[in-house]
Structure formats: C-alpha cells, structure tokens
C-alpha cells in the first residue's frame, strides 16, 4: 500500500512537471508573438517617418524656391515636423524599452533572446539611418536659407561674412543688419524675405535641438551593438562553414559508398565465376568417373 502511494505521488509530480513545461512553452510563444507585434509596429513607424522626411525635403525645396513662401506651405511643414517628432519619440521609447527587457534577460542565453537582439539591432540602425537623413535635410535647408538671407542683404547694400550672419542668427534679432536698410520697394521685399528666412531658421534650429538628444541616444545604442552584430555575423559565417564542410563530407561519403558498391559487385561477379568454374570442374570429374 505504501509503495503504491509513492508511485501515485511520483506520477502526480511527473504530470505537474509536464504541465509546467507546457505552460512555459505557451507563455514563451505568447511573449514572442507580442514581441514581433511590437517589432512590426515600430518598423511601420520608422517607414512612416521616412515618408515624412521625403515630404519635408519637397516642402524645403518649395520654400527655398519662392521669395515669399505661401503660409500654407509653412503650416504643412510645421505639421509634418510635429508628426516626425511625435513618431520619432514613440520609436525611441519602444527601442529603449526593448533594450531594457533584453538586458534583463541577458543571463538566460536562448534562441529567442538572440532573435530579439538581432531584430532590435536592425530596427535601431534603420531608425538612425532615417533620422540621419532628416538631420542632413534640416542642415541643408538651414545653409541654403542662410545663403538666401546673405544674398538679400547684398541686394540692400549690406555685405556680411558667414561669422556675422551666424551672430545675427544666434542673437535671434535680424534688426542688427536690417535697421539701416534704405526705404525702397526692392529693399522692402528683400527685408520681408530676410525676416521670413530668419524665422524659418529659428524654428528649424529649435526642431534640431529637440531631436538632438534623441538622435544621440539611439546613435550610442547602435554603436554599443556593433560588437554584438560582429559576433552574430561571425557565428553565421562559422555556421555556413560547418554547413559547407558537412556538404563536402556528404559528397565524399556518397563517392566512397559508390566506389565500395562497385567493388562489391565486382567481387560478387568474381565469386560467381569462380563457383561456376568450380562446379564445371566437379561435374567433369564426376563424369569421368
């Protein structure tokens, strides 16, 4: 009776272990499904930012090509800039949250952890690439706007150096150079453009500063992932090498097997021939007797 009780207890423990294993597997699958859902959402956000950056470039060109840009064009650019910042913040927060969870699970080396690291790294690099393009577009727009201001100042008879122009932009007061402009129709139009371009640059610089910390955050994250990516690449290369070696060994084995089969057939034929000759000799001997 006591032995039977022990058997039942052992069976129950085994069933409990099996149930726990199933629950862990289900939980892990659900976790990875949620992870891939976040990955897809983040990827779509980055793609949308990329689209917005291309739209912003077009609006920059329109604004630069017109002496006095339409207010609607500037409003559209403002809305686009706000949307880019909103989505970029969302992506940054998602990536940092993923990074935190990966660091917490670092002690457990598993296949899904490597997958999460790889996916996170790919998205981080893609995000930095898109934001770098946006930053380059902003800097280009600033330089070209500054060039337009410089040309308009020359039209009014005021020549300025790059250093003087930067001083005006940093002060936030275009009156430093526009206060003594001659009152004429040409000068008024030039003055209007100077003030408009100056406001564009001030707004732009505010946007660049807001995005700077975010950009550096993710750029540092990607830099830290460099070694990890190199290790992943090395592991992949080693895996490919092993596959190639295994394939070569398989070819050799097939070749040797084929050669062995041929030798076996030859031996069998020789044995059959020898047996035939032996049978013939025995037959002749019996006949003679």
UniProtKB/Swiss-Prot annotation:
Sequence ranges on the Cytoplasmic membrane side: 1-263
Ranges per topology, Extracellular? 285-289
Per the UniProt record, one Pfam family is Syntaxin
Q: Where is the t-SNARE coiled-coil homology domain?
A: 191-253
Q: Which SMART domains match?
A: SynN, t_SNARE
Please tell me, according to the UniProt entry, what happens when changing residue 41 to G: Found in a patient with congenital cataract and developmental delay; uncertain significance
Write down any Gene Ontology CC term. Answer: azurophil granule
Q: Which InterPro entries match?
A: SNARE, STX3_SNARE, Syntaxin, Syntaxin/epimorphin_CS, Syntaxin_N, T_SNARE_dom
User: What keywords sit in the KW lines?
Assistant: Cell membrane, Coiled coil, Disease variant, Membrane, Neurotransmitter transport, Nucleus, Transmembrane, Transmembrane helix, Transport
Q: Give the stretches traversing the membrane.
A: 264-284
Q: Gene3D superfamilies, per this entry? A: 1.20.5.110, 1.20.58.70
GO molecular function, a single term: SNAP receptor activity
Q: GO annotations under biological process?
A: exocytic insertion of neurotransmitter receptor to postsynaptic membrane; intracellular protein transport; long-term synaptic potentiation; neuron projection development; neurotransmitter transport; organelle membrane fusion; positive regulation of cell adhesion; positive regulation of cell population proliferation
Tell me which domain of life the UniProt entry assigns to the organism this sequence originates from. Answer: Eukaryota
List the residue ranges forming a coiled coil, or say none. 32-111
Q: What does the subunit comment say?
A: Interacts with REEP6. Interacts with PRPH2 in rod and cone photoreceptors. Interacts with ROM1. Interacts with SNAP25. Interacts with VAMP2.
Its biological purpose: Potentially involved in docking of synaptic vesicles at presynaptic active zones. Apical receptor involved in membrane fusion of apical vesicles.
Q: What family is this?
A: Belongs to the syntaxin family.
Q: Which disease is it linked to?
A: Retinal dystrophy and microvillus inclusion disease: An autosomal recessive disease characterized by early-onset, severe retinal dystrophy associated with intractable congenital diarrhea. Intestinal biopsies show loss of microvilli, microvillus inclusions, and accumulation of subapical vesicles in villus enterocytes. Diarrhea 12, with microvillus atrophy: An autosomal recessive congenital enteropathy characterized by intractable secretory diarrhea, resulting in severe dehydration and metabolic acidosis. DIAR12 can be diagnosed based on variable loss of brush-border microvilli, microvillus inclusions, and accumulation of subapical vesicles in villus enterocytes.
Any idea what this protein is called? Syntaxin-3
């Amino acid at each position: 009776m006591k032995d039977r009780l022990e058997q039942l207890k052992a069976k129950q423990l085994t069933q409990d272990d099996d149930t726990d294993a199933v629950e862990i597997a289900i939980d892990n699958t659900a976790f990875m499904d949620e992870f891939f859902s976040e990955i897809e959402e983040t990827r779509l956000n980055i793609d949308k930012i990329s689209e917005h950056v291309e739209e912003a470039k077009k609006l920059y060109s329109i604004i630069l090509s017109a002496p006095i840009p339409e207010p609607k064009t500037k409003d559209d650019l403002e809305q686009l800039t706000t949307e880019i910042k909103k989505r970029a913040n969302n992506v940054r927060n998602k990536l940092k949250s993923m990074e935190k969870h990966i660091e917490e699970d670092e002690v457990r080396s598993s296949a899904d952890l490597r997958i999460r690291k790889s996916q996170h790294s790919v998205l981080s690099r893609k995000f930095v690439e898109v934001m770098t393009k946006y930053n380059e577009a902003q800097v280009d727009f600033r330089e070209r706007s500054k060039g337009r201001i410089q040309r308009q100042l020359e039209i009014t008879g005021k020549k300025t150096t790059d250093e003087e122009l930067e001083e005006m932009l940093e002060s936030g007061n275009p009156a430093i150079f526009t206060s003594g402009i001659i009152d004429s129709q040409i000068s008024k139009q030039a003055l209007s453009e100077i003030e408009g371009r100056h406001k564009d640059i001030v707004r732009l610089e505010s946007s660049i500063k807001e995005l700077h910390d975010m950009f550096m955050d993710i750029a540092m994250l990607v830099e830290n992932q460099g070694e990890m990516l190199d290790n992943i690449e090395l592991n992949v290369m080693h895996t490919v090498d092993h596959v190639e070696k295994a394939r070569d060994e398989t070819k050799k084995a097939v070749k040797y097997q084929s050669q062995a089969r041929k030798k076996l057939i030859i031996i069998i034929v020789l044995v059959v021939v020898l047996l035939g000759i032996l049978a013939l000799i025995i037959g002749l001997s019996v006949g003679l007797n």
